[in-house]
Amino acid sequence: MKRSKNFEKRKKFIMELLGDPLYKPMRLREIASLLQLDKSEKKELFDVLDELCAQGKAEVDNKGRYSKVSGKRRDRRKNKEALKAEKPERGRKGRERREKNHEEYRFSEKDGTLMEGTFIGHYKGFGFVEVEGQEQDIFIPENDTGSAMHQDKVQILVRNGHKEGKRQEGVVLKVLERGMPSIVGTYQSSRDYGFVISDNPKFSKDIFISRKNSMGAKDGDKVVAEITDYGSRNRKPEGKITEVLGNLRSPGTDILAIVKSFNIPSVFPDKVLRQADRVSDHVQEADLDGRLDLRNLVTVTIDGEDAKDLDDAISLTKEDGIYHLGVHIADVSNYVQGGSALDREALKRGTSVYLADRVIPMLPERLSNGICSLNQGQDRLTLSCLMDVNEKGKVISHKIAETVIRVDERMCYTDVKNILEDTDEVAKKRYEALIPMFFLMKELSGILRSRRHTRGSIDFDFPESKIILNAAGRAIDVQPYEANVATRIIEDFMLLANETVAQEYCTGDYPFVYRTHENPDPEKIESLLMLLHNEGVNIQKSGQEITPGEIQEILESIEGMPNEAQISRLTLRTMKQAKYTTECSGHFGLAAKYYCHFTSPIRRYPDLQIHRIIHDRLRGRLVREGRTEHYKEILDEVARQSSVCERRADEAERESDKLKKAEYMSYHLGEEYEGIISGVTGWGLYVELPNTVEGLIHINTLRDDYYVFDQDAYELRGDITGKIFRLGQKVRVRVADADKMLKTVDFVLVEED
């Protein structure tokens, strides 16, 4: 055998590769692809591997995959046969066959039904395909995923022979459209190459990165990698690093990685910033033309202590049994013109995003914290919903007007709460002149809440999480953050304004964007009613579909039960996600016939959009200038884009919280806590701690019995002992693991003495 001068060097390099901790057993063609070898070099690789196997330094399994020898030497003849089996087909036909998806020539339509959908990956290698209009996803076994990756649009063949009660199985025939042109992950370097391991566990394949495409990334760096070759069933995808975000341990890199992974725009283009800089930082005299002057009306803002983008203010008086409520909203549309660079960027973002260590605003801070923010003592342009409300909480008359206001006090929730609960003498003295208005607000808020309750509005009152970070961005505490009397006042007044505006524009049949919420999924409701029945709670539906009032009845019937919070969450999960539409189809959760988002134009694009419509109507432009047709053309896309951006922001915010909770718990490994079982599944028990952190007790750590999941009763039951774990049950747990990368917390059960 004729050898090149570098044969021994290459043999040494291959041994280092096989021994690398990151290396996973590969076939000959996979190794050749990984090393980007040409035809002649591939032949030498064959010889190198052959000799290493003969020397007992490497071994090959029955699938032709090579690894460093692990104490058991293989027969050389078997190795050679496996190597021969791995030799690629020669010529055009062989090349074409290799390039085709392996399933395209193994299956035909007679074997099943062709469908198209979105591939949802799983970290274990298998996946699911979501098919529009089909309730249950199609399961795709690991060996049948082809080159499909998470979020790809794929064509699949759903196999015949589906048994009732079991999930349908399919095989990926073809990738129609790639869903993820790039990924965010952690770079792991080796000698002459590296891999990017995706932060998204649904993206199960590591991306091979050659040294020349690494952008100088170091081991452990968070990076963005563009996928240049999606690989195949037997070959890893390849890519190039396009951005190095920083080392994993650097402050803020972890959250920045989440921002990048969700493709959330975080840097404003220069053109947008220049346009924002041209906006005056004070109200111009010309801006007041045609506006109702309410600067002498006593108004306050009530927000969180740290809030800087104050987009709503309140005024309230009472006369002859009638409440005169003013909800005054920042007139952002006066400064952000439709179709401008500012507007296009705002639509692209859709919403402000609130992450654990940062806010990514929809608008540049010069606007959101400046001229658009209703800052104390400064003239500000607003759109006001002025409502007369009777003592039953009914709006008996209203007016929507272009206004100018001057806020008298910038209040925070804590001060208003303490004043109303008589716990802060300093605050009471400081805001003495406003105290009667605050108590009037509390009075009206209670009336409005009671009225909504009577019509069937559903109130899920869960504590949110407040994550405390230190200067380095590390989580040092996690606390529950619950609603209070002050937050409820603002919520009730904003809901009323949103309903009032929506009703006027829906009954007037104007083009508009509504906030709609469909009825829950009937199957999920049936499962919930079965669970409640097992808990001794029987709810009878009045018709085919459940009503908001019946959901409210469920929540009232479980009040005071040990598992109240957990069943409330399960009830919430039966709900569909609210969205933006141009059809006024009602809001199930609020039991409202009319609803929109009018009150937050600084941080939500639909609010900004409907402000423009209101302006055009008030100034007669809808008909006179043909604006009605313009809005009919654009609003469907505005609603769709806004819904997509909202879901993206919600998911990013959840991931941010999960990451920081896992980080916090990683500093408390081995510590014990009291918790409540918040979820029961076939793979274990979810337990929620008083600080809102949730973790999993894996079923394989429950070693005292063999536990079986009863889906109808929502419990784990010991096969031998009969021991039961149920929703809402108190347990004591020890923190076993907290994985910041996977954003998970693992507990083990602390057995009772």
Question: Which residues are covered by each model-predicted region?
Answer:
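Charge-lined substrate channels and their catalytic hotspots, especially those that engage the 3′ end
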Residues: M1-G326, S333-D379, K417, Y714-L716, ...
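Electropositive polyanion-binding surfaces
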Residues: Y230, A257-K260, I264, K271-D705, ...
